[in-house]
Amino acid sequence: MASWPPLELQSSNQSQLFPQNATACDNAPEAWDLLHRVLPTFIISICSFGLLGNLFVLLVFLLPRRRLNVAEIYLANLAASDLVFVLGLPFWAENIWNQFNWPFGALLCRGINGVIKANLFISIFLVVAISQDRYCLLVHPMASRRRQRRRQARVTCVLIWVVGGLLSIPTFLLRSIQAVPDLNITACILLLPHEAWHFARIVELNILAFLLPLAAIVFFNYHILASLRGREEVSRTRCGGRKDSKTTALILTLVVAFLVCWAPYHFFAFLEFLFQVQAIRSCFWEDFIDLGLQLANFLAFTNSSLNPVIYVFVGRLFRTKVWELYKQCTPKSLAPISSSHRKEIFQLFWRN
């Protein structure tokens, strides 16, 4: 194929990745020239926003001198995962700018791609865990104990990070740099040792990392929404009902944003698998999949910088935590206005 997506670059051997007639399907040179010029700038912008935004989220969650609740434990881990992910984006921006000529050596080829692959699993598993926690809290509230949920959340997050790391081991082992004399580049590619690995990879990528988690997310959130509709009047009078509803609204927004950002990537990854096993063939499909994967990767990248924006504009309780942190870090002499006046200003400024 004409190019390779940053999240998963693969080849069984060089002849498959760069066939003799590879240029026969080069039907969109203008599109590729535009992509090589424009996409790196957007990726660096995403990296900058994601770095600052996720650092801000982690500071808001971790600086206050109190224990995190269950939702905050999951959201802090999601922010940490996004932060690690965006740290690898400048390398891929430079890679695309160089027309996929990897300049950073074999170690970073494996390390950066391994981290990106681990983040793919960690993020989706955290979204499942967050949805499952909301499901237990709202659909089965009598069986949900706060202390037990907090301990379970910590253990779950540790397991998710470990599993994500284990699932990225093939990427660490099979990634390598390879010279491509016809294109005069040295590419960072995933060297699959056997044709069967293509099938194993798509099972891992599309089923384990998307379809199964998607089924769980849809199940949990369907019952969450049904529970919220059925208990709307009760939740208004129940202690903490408004707080639970606000937190659930934030989490549902995060879930929708995650699926919108990542679904196109998995769709094009599946099309790429069909192309590799020759289920679909033609220059149209090759160019469509190549360009589509690049744009789908970009959309997936945006999710890591979008989450902090969602926290600020959807998460009212998060904004309250920001205000509390500001009061904690600001000397009283610098904030002489009355608390009621300050609260009024705060509510007017952040009103949705």
Curated annotation (Swiss-Prot):
Keyword Cell membrane annotated: yes
Example of a GO MF term: bradykinin receptor activity
Positions glycosylated per UniProt: 13, 21, 184
The entry's keywords: Cell membrane, Disulfide bond, G-protein coupled receptor, Glycoprotein, Lipoprotein, Membrane, Palmitate, Receptor, Transducer, Transmembrane, Transmembrane helix
GO biological process: calcium-mediated signaling; cell chemotaxis; immune response; inflammatory response; positive regulation of cytosolic calcium ion concentration; response to mechanical stimulus
Paired cysteines (S-S): 109-188
Extracellular side: 1-41, 94-110, 175-206, 272-294
Ranges in the topological domain labelled Cytoplasmic: 63-72, 132-153, 228-250, 316-352
Organism superkingdom: Eukaryota
Subcellular location(s) per record: Cell membrane
Lipid positions (S-palmitoyl cysteine): 329
A GO CC term attached to the entry: external side of plasma membrane
Main location: membrane
Entry keyword Disulfide bond: yes
Function: This is a receptor for bradykinin. Could be a factor in chronic pain and inflammation.
Descriptive protein name: B1 bradykinin receptor
Organism for this UniProt entry: Chlorocebus pygerythrus
